[in-house]
């Protein structure tokens, strides 16, 4: 990607709550960064060139969930959706952070951060990519209390910072921002 086209991602921080570990790392939302024409094929090629693997294509997933064993990236190639971050299934509605995404946007969700669609256009579609070598995601639904000694916290903390940012590569925000936080 041409350095002159760099766009700083939006950052959404969500702290641990009673039912979701969430993460010390912010969710990153890159606006209108996918190549045109924005379609499934071009989105897949673009995100996979930076050592992230495509593992599926989905529409809206309304069930609030998080992955304790891997980071996840959405490449939105069609439609739009309002997402919620940081709010688990047992949390009071409105406790999370909301963000609307649309075709051309990329979202990077750190391991442990609850996420779901709240509303979506009928044609909303995205690909899911994961750092190369990551295990198959496992979903938790934020329906039980997370205690200080919960094994989920150690599992999430053991997920490595990605080698590459899915949009900008080795020196991209997911690498630089998250490494700085982890080293702090």
Which residues make up each language-model segment?
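Short, conserved beta-strand element in jelly-roll/cupin
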Residues: 69-87, 108
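Residue-level signature for short turns and capping positions that connect secondary-structure elements
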Residues: 35, 88-90, 114, 122, ...
């Amino acid at each position: 990607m041409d350095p002159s086209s760099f766009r700083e991602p939006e950052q959404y921080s969500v702290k641990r709550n009673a039912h979701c570990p969430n993460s010390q790392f912010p969710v990153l939302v890159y606006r209108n960064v996918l190549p045109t024409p924005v379609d499934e094929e071009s989105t897949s090629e673009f995100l996979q060139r930076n050592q992230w693997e495509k593992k599926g294509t989905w529409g809206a997933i309304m069930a609030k969930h998080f992955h304790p064993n891997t980071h996840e990236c959405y490449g939105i190639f069609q439609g739009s959706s309002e997402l919620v971050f940081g709010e688990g299934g047992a949390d009071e509605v409105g406790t999370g952070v909301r963000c609307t995404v649309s075709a051309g946007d990329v979202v990077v969700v750190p391991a442990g951060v609850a996420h779901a669609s709240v509303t979506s256009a009928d044609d909303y579609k995205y690909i899911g990519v994961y750092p190369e070598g990551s295990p198959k995601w496992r979903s938790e639904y934020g329906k039980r209390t997370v205690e200080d000694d919960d094994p989920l916290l150690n599992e999430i903390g053991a997920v490595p910072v990605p080698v590459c940012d899915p949009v900008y590569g080795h020196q991209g925000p997911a690498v630089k921002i998250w490494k700085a936080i982890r080293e702090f």
